[in-house]
Amino acid sequence: MESLLLPVLLLLAVLWTQAAALINLKYSVEEEQRAGTVIANVAKDAREAGFALDPRQASAFRVVSNSAPHLVDINPSSGLLVTKQKIDRDLLCRQSPKCIISLEVMSSSMEICVIKVEIKDLNDNAPSFPAAQIELEISEAASPGTRIPLDSAYDPDSGSFGVQTYELTPNELFGLEIKTRGDGSRFAELVVEKSLDRETQSHYSFRITALDGGDPPHMGTVGLSIKVTDSNDNNPVFGESTYSVSVPENSPPNTPVIRLNASDPDEGTNGQVVYSFYGYVNDRTRELFQIDPHSGLVTVTGALDYEEGHVYELDVQAKDLGPNSIPAHCKVTVSVLDTNDNPPIINLLSVNSELVEVSESAPPGYVIALVRVSDRDSGLNGRVQCRLLGNVPFRLQEYESFSTILVDGRLDREQHDQYNLTIQARDSGVPMLQSAKSFTVRITDENDNHPHFSKPYYQVIVQENNTPGAYLLSVSARDPDMGLNGSVSYQIVPSQVRDMPVFTYVSINPNSGDIYALRSFNHEQTKAFEFKVLAKDGGLPSLQSNATVRVIILDVNDNTPVITAPPLINGTAEVYIPRNSGIGYLVTVVKADDYDEGENGRVTYDMTEGDRGFFEIDQVNGEVRTTRTFNENSKPSYELIVVAHDHGKTSLSASALVLIYLSPALDAQESMGSVNLSLIFIIALGSIAGILFVTMIFVAIKCKRDNKEIRTYNCSNCLTITCLLGCFIKGQNSKCLHCISVSPNSEEQDKKAEEKVSLRGKRIAEYSYGHQKKSSKKKKISKNDIRLVPRDVEETDKMNVVSCSSLTSSLNYFDYHQQTLPLGCRRSESTFLNVENQNTRNTTASHIYHHSFNSQGPQQPDLIINGVPLPETENYSFDSNYVNSRAHLIKSSSTFKDLEGNSLKDSGHEESDQTDSEHDVQRSLYCDTAVNDVLNTSVTSMGSQMPDHDQNEGFHCREECRILGHSDRCWMPRNPMPTRSKSPEHVRNIIALSIEATAADVEAYDDCGPTKRTFATFGKDVSSHRAEERPILKGKRTVDVTICSPKVNSAIREAGNGCEAISPVTSPLHLKSPLPTKPSISYTVALAPPAHDLEHHANSGASRPSEAEPRGADNEKVMHEVNPIRKDGRDKESPSVKRLKDIVL
């Protein structure tokens, strides 16, 4: 039995389900089968019973226990139950009614299968007797009914295949009676049926046949020899035929079991009784018990074990020593009593008997191990109770034949990574026996912890103007998980800071959590910003958490105060006060803005230089007031240097020159009190708004009326200034193409064209030649006086520039009102056309005073500001007398970045667009500032190359355009944005707008040194011109707007004193390039007098002073004549002239 129970002690894998699965499978096989006989397919039957078997695993079953491992076994891979050798049931189970082999196997899915194989008996053995002959002696005194037990036949087969009956040779004296023992075996007794008479017959011979229950039955025979002896009248007699006795299993040897006593009334040897085991008493029983033949005491001779056998039957006979003794028989049944002599046995079924691993995410009720506890004792001695020792998050759940260890709480590896479990089992016997089994449970890690920041809110303070890449702070998050589950990486959550991604402000090291600044912060733009940092682990799926980081930017004194009031021009403000101002009179209010905060942005005011004795300034509000009174003897102007400085640790300041002029005294009522500046400001704004509104309505109505005549724009060259002028004179945009390509060739055509010239064109002509109220020689020009002709190649390095027409200054002109030649316009010869007088087209003429420039560069400039070309670069160098604020404005100009919006836009609608040149009503206001800037600015320019394209076709023209006419797309620019390509293929447009002079208008010029020449003053002798130089001049006259500011006149007068500018109305400009590789270009600023003045001075050549006379007087004379004309033309500008100026500008 011990060998059969040893496999139960094997340890197996952990059961995965919450309750262990257990099934019972029963099979049967007949004995005497050869080795390898397949009993059953356990895998198939287990799968049908609900087992989850993994076909991918090589080993599906494992035997836990096997009561006959030498006879049967299970194939672990196929699950077939097979025999290992020939099974002899008669030898294995002897006479047991059932012969069963038990196996317990566990599948790969941790499920238990109990298999019982019943060995079916075959009738393969015949009954046999222990001896070949049975000899009996029967006293003749034996009365009928006397029973004499016979030796039983033995049949190894069991059940119905064992001995079932006995047969005796038929006779009249003796018979057989069949009886059954307690173990089911049958035996026969010989019964005397009639009285015997030794004298009649003393010897009998019979045959006894034993039959089993087979079909056909097997049989065994034995001879029976009966000898009739003389009688012993009394036989021993037992008190009872059956005795029952019990003995503890732990009884030592020689322990008495029972004392038998059989009485015999005879005397002597006939009454002396002898005891012995008789009949069928197996050898094992004879090993355990013995009987004293004289006393009849039955004692224990071997070790009793209740678990091995708990009932034994002893057949005892007693006979006297007399002759013809007839023995007496009795049966003693010995019951072995169970004692608590076996402690419980604990078997742990898991993957590893010493170490069990379970995930910390295992839910309550999860099975981690299977426990089987056994006790060989019976009853209360074998009733076992199990429990887990200690306070652990596990519990033991008991079932009928096994127990499971379940998770009974939340497991947390971070708090407790392993447990030592002890299982204790105890029985209920007396004394109580117990046993214990210990093993280790290791908790495996799961990604169940989020990264945890050391604090949810971080704040860092950094000064503005920090270095990009500067370290700000570090964030830290901890994850108590292990391995990748505990590795933390950082990233910034996408967000916006001032409409910009936060990634443009800061970055984070994903491993260390260090945060760095990606830009230099500006407190004035961003005082503080927040963003979130995300920390996530490396588990699957990853867990994450975030923290908020706030960056506070401290202000530093990095902004210089900017004086905003009074308005400054080149750092100078002019203020007018009445001469009769009293003490405390408010002269002006100085205002300065500082974008810093706190003390860094608090501005105070002071006067550092100038006439401080006459004025004082309030340091807080910047009010400049008088400290003295003024009279008629006071000087007309005063100067103050006003300084605005902040209160930062390193104070920054800005200064301005305030020029205070004394104006005529105010009336008494006007001089009382200070002027209400707010009221004046409101009235001025209202007036300007009203004027602008009326102007817009007038322009809209006018444009709408003009556009209703025809709404097609088929001229690809109308984007140039020259073409716009020609189209404007004709008054019809649709015929712009004809204004370039068509010119009358006959006087009849000239007259028809001259009749069509509108009043607008006449006013333009009048304005272009000057306007005189009282002159009777006023000469008008018609459309026939203006013709666009191809410019000669040798003059491509010269450009006539239209002069300015307004005296008003504005610093914003350079920023927003620069004219450009549309880059999309085709560079054809029509781009380089001159306006030519039809009447003097073939006559010899000379230049009138005009702006010209000479260049040796390969290209022409892209930008023209009031007729003066600017270089392509956006950064300029200025002379020392040019103020820094002007340079700042030009460098920061947005005009160079958006030329398309101001130069190329034409919507094609009836009304002008807001960015069209016709819509810009303030363009003339910026002229003088531009002229002054040009007079003080040095720039460089590139030359141009003459393209070879057809003058009437645009970039988008096709062959159909020559037949059907041009469409809107023909004049559209090729590139929407101007590029600054310096390739030779990218040619520029230069507009030369000239009007030929008549022969009477030819001017004289004089040499200035051996190499330089400039135009002579009015009234010089025409004969002074050398004949060989006349053809070079081409006789063209610039259509210039001749109204300029007094500053320009003074500059011209100063320039006229030198040899470089002999003419009083010309002044050379030298524009210097910031790039040393480009050649410098010389410009000549010219003011054209009216045509009749030219004739007047040309005809009065005899009365002119000689060349040796001083030229200053001649200059003054001309200027006296020119200035009234210029003033008169400025006072009586017509709307057409204004529009012409807008177009030209």
From Swiss-Prot:
Residues 700-1145 are cytoplasmic. Ca(2+) 11 binds at E360, E414, D445, E446, D448, D481. Ca(2+) 4 binds at E140, E199, D233. Pfam families: Cadherin (PF00028), Cadherin_2 (PF08266). Ca(2+) 7 binds at E249, D305, E307, D341, N342. Residues 22-129, 130-238, 239-346, 350-453, 454-563, 569-672 form the Cadherin domain. It is a single-pass type I membrane protein. GO terms for cellular component: plasma membrane. Ca(2+) 6 binds at N232, N234, D264, D266, N270. GO terms for biological process: homophilic cell adhesion via plasma membrane adhesion molecules. Residues 906-921, 1106-1145 have a biased composition (Basic and acidic residues). Disulfide bonds join C93-C99. Its main location: membrane. The keyword Disulfide bond applies. Ca(2+) 3 binds at N123, N125, D155, D157, D212. One of its GO terms (molecular function) is calcium ion binding. Ca(2+) 2 binds at E31, D90, D121, D124, D157. Glycans are attached at N261, N420, N485, N546, N570, N676. It is found in: Cell membrane. This is Protocadherin-19.
